[in-house]
């Protein structure tokens, strides 16, 4: 494949090209500081967890799919929707400085349906953040542009001081993929 980011992944030691998306977001928004506690939702194969841990963060990676170990990263294979109560018990009253979500559904090829499916994952990630994100924390979530992303963005604006759309250069130009970077968590009532 003639993709500069795919070629760079092996040279730079990243597990996926998506690592460069997070590097770009960190360069622009200064997401990470050493010693932060971070949750990486939809972590497998681990590119985002690698980036966050290299910045000196304490990372807990969650994914329904398996993931090979990364030094300094705790991995929990789980379904954040169907196993939420187990996770709530595990993390109890813990709070995290940053919650990242690069979750995406398996594409069916129908953009409108893929959009609906990713927005359901976005809502699940946001519910997770409502429970576990610390006051002033950061939430980054992948979306596909479509009918309801603006409503979701407006929902975030009620809970965060700053919310920005971001399309990384390392994202494929033909993709409807974007990220919402939400800074300064003010708080909200969890839905569960």
From Swiss-Prot:
Listed transmembrane segments:
none
Which reaction does this enzyme catalyse, per its entry? uridine(2552) in 23S rRNA + S-adenosyl-L-methionine = 2'-O-methyluridine(2552) in 23S rRNA + S-adenosyl-L-homocysteine + H(+)
The active-site annotation reads: 142
Keyword Oxidoreductase in record: no
| Cell compartment(s), UniProt | Cytoplasm
What broad class describes the main subcellular location of this protein? cytoplasm
- Tell me its EC number(s), please: 2.1.1.166
A single Gene Ontology MF term assigned here is: rRNA (uridine-2'-O-)-methyltransferase activity
Class of the enzyme per the UniProt entry, highest EC level: transferase
Annotated InterPro entries: RNA_methyltr_RlmE (IPR050082), RNA_MeTrfase_FtsJ_dom (IPR002877), rRNA-MeTfrase_E (IPR015507), SAM-dependent_MTases_sf (IPR029063)
Q: Which family does it belong to?
A: Belongs to the class I-like SAM-binding methyltransferase superfamily. RNA methyltransferase RlmE family.
Q: Give the protein name, as stated in the record.
A: Ribosomal RNA large subunit methyltransferase E
Question: Native species of this protein?
Answer: Wolbachia pipientis wMel
Kindly list the organism's lineage. Bacteria, Pseudomonadati, Pseudomonadota, Alphaproteobacteria, Rickettsiales
